[in-house]
A protein has these predicted regions:
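Surface segments flanking catalytic/ligand-binding clefts of nucleic-acid enzymes
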Residues: 130-282
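Short gly/ser-rich loop at a beta-strand->alpha-helix junction or flexible surface loop bordering the NTP-binding
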Residues: 1-146, 259-282
């Protein structure tokens, strides 16, 4: 029993203490001694409503191991009246997973009651990395109930991308209706972005990741594009600064290659921000 949960008082006693500011009503039948934070209230509801589990953005934060925030979103097979800090949706068919000490609806189900922005942030973070697509496939196979909007959101996100610049370019290419893969393997080498239909491979480098300080990385950075080119792929390579300052050029060049209308900008030093005075400071 949570120490802040109010028990053993009559309705009249509770009403009196609410008026005095000693008790706070959180939801129908759920009162606490004073204010509680979102984590505390989630624990109380887990005890008092065993049929209810975390849902929506609350569940997404739980999956990511983040601090919970109000309002708490829950799902239940039963009807529960929520409150200012608690929102409950009723699901006739409810599947849940135990994650980081709490019960949550399946991650892809939780997306259905989260905002598009929160859902996009979650997908980008939760399914990042080279095994992101594999983990997403597993979760898709294990999720029985998912809305069309959720499927559309998943299709629009850069699943498996490792960095923000990669996600920006993948999102832009998907908006142009290209089928794009991230962390795609060609000849044993992994490429940040690939458009398989048009055999276009893209690598987006940070400032330090592909430095030539080590001979192994130096050699790989040469033989990797050689291998892709020998297999008939068009290879593009950009820096994170190219995406930051000239994303339109990056996207136009990739799209142009896919559409058969190559985009050929002037020589780099005539337009790239980093070639201007003070460019390396921003």
């Amino acid at each position: 029993m949570h120490e802040k949960l109010v028990t053993g008082l009559s309705r009249h006693q509770i009403s009196t203490r609410i008026a005095r500011g000693e008790i706070v009503k959180q939801a129908r039948g759920i009162h606490t001694w004073g204010e509680v934070d979102a984590q505390e209230l989630a624990k109380i509801l887990d005890q008092e409503w065993p049929d209810a589990v975390l849902d929506g953005e609350t569940a997404l934060r739980q999956y990511l191991g983040l601090q919970l925030k109000f309002p708490l979103q829950l799902a239940s097979r039963k009807q529960h009246a929520g409150g200012v800090n608690v929102q409950v949706r009723r699901l006739s068919k409810l599947e849940w997973w135990y994650v980081n000490g709490g019960r949550c609806v399946a991650p892809l189900t939780a997306l259905g009651s989260a905002s598009e922005e929160a859902g996009r942030r979650f997908l980008n973070r939760y399914y990042a990395g080279f095994d992101g697509k594999r983990r997403l496939s597993q979760d898709l196979a294990g999720t029985k109930y998912m809305s069309k909007q959720t499927r559309a959101l998943i299709d629009s996100v850069a699943i498996g991308a490792d960095s923000a610049p990669e996600r920006e370019i993948i999102t832009a290419l998907k908006q142009a209706r290209l089928r794009v893969e991230s962390n795609y393997e060609i000849g044993g080498y992994r490429w940040d972005i690939a458009v398989k239909k048009h055999k276009v491979a893209v690598e987006i480098d940070g400032y330090g990741y592909h430095s030539s300080d080590k001979m192994e990385a130096f050699l790989k950075d040469h033989w990797k594009p050689n291998d892709a080119a020998a297999r008939g792929w068009t290879v593009f390579r950009y820096s994170g600064s190219c995406v930051k300052h000239h994303k339109d050029y990056v996207v136009r060049q990739i799209l142009g290659q896919c559409e058969g209308t190559p985009f050929l900008p002037p020589p780099l030093w005539k337009w790239h921000k980093l070639f201007r005075p003070g460019g390396w400071r921003g």
